[in-house]
Amino acid sequence: MLKVVEAFSGIGSQVEALKNIKIDYEVSATVDWEISAIYTYDILHNGKQNLKDYRLHHKESIVDKLTTYNLSSNGKDPITRRAMMAMPTVQLKSLLAAIERTNNLIDITSVNADQLPNDIDVLTYSFPCQDLSVSSFWHNNFSGITKGVGNKSGLLWEIERLLKDFSNKNKPFPKFLLMENVSAILSRHHIDNFNLWKKFLEDLGYYNQVYTLNSNKFNVAQDRQRTFMISVLCETPIIESNVDHYFSLNNLENVDLLKTKNISDYLRLDYDNNQYLHEAILATPNFTESRKKIMENNRILAVDRLANEHLNAATLTTKQDRNPNSGIIKFEKEVIKIGSQYRNLTPRECFLLMGFKENDFDTIIENDLEVLSGKKFLSNARLYKLTGNSIVVPVLEEIFKQINQINTEILKPTVSILQ
């Protein structure tokens, strides 16, 4: 069994990957402060909530509990008590239930070694990319993962703090660390800081394997390049040699899985299906001059009900009604909204392009909360953001296969794979 701790857990793409490849696992703790991610993670991986244990709580008592956590509704700023009091009681109860069911420690800046088990196999950390991304460059933000600047991407160094706490308390380090972020982390602006991070891990005894992987090589119709680092704790030189040899023979950058899926497997173009039609209408913007440019400048993934099967979606980001976006569906004969000439990808299609299953999305929608009359907690804007911030599941599947193989064949046995 792999015992996993997910820092910056999002909606749990790591757990989804482990489920898919049928590796026995246990999530000891998660860490995320954004409330829609917390709730979605819980519903996706633990199923429908039963709030009967919270039936005697009133709003004030629930808020008293929730305000002890550092929660956020936008991933940027903490929620105030006043804002919490404005939320429906059922939403507050559901949020508290989600925190407790996922053992969410919420605030990475306050997590310490005492809160985590002694036998962690894998600690994952997909820290925020805002200060590393290309968009930050265009806004003259070069702070990246510079230590001590107090930005979002700098939360990487909270993992350093946590590992130092492990050391100070003579607590065993996790066997594996798994990092994911944008590939700009390897750019000339950020490579020195990244090398500083790698050196810290090496000094603790970790062997670092860095991969830059594109999801289009993993049978996913999305062009999404991300950088991963698997860090393996090597307690002896022979183990380190064996791990190095393993990665030299099994480099995932050389993988190009047989393509059995194309964009038509992800698009929902059957508008005779009322649910697909409803979602498509919500993803169809009013046609304006700026949206004319969106239509002209972005990939046309389908025309009416016919997909362009040779195309992949561009990288999914946290918004679709923008330029550039991940691709559009153009209307020539199809009319789902008067005056419209195209639509964006729907949240369902985005979830599928990140490697989640359709019934995963249906589970989320079926368990969504009504926060106001006719207004759901998981709005389309929130769903787009959740998927844009996630990790492509089939890529993680191949990474976890490697972690599991190293764990069972190199770290646990004493027999060298070189023999």
Task: Describe the function of each predicted region.
Residues 17, 40, 158, 162, ...:
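Amphipathic alpha-helical segments that form well-ordered structural scaffolds
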Residues 282-419:
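C-terminal target-recognition/interaction regions appended to catalytic cores
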Residues 44, 245, 331-334:
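Short Gly/aromatic-enriched secondary-structure transition segments
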Residues 111-122, 132-322:
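Class I S-adenosyl-L-methionine
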Residues 2-173, 183-188, 192:
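Core alpha/beta nucleotide-donor-binding catalytic domains of modification enzymes
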Residues 53-61, 244, 409-419:
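Short, flexible loop/turn segments with low-complexity composition
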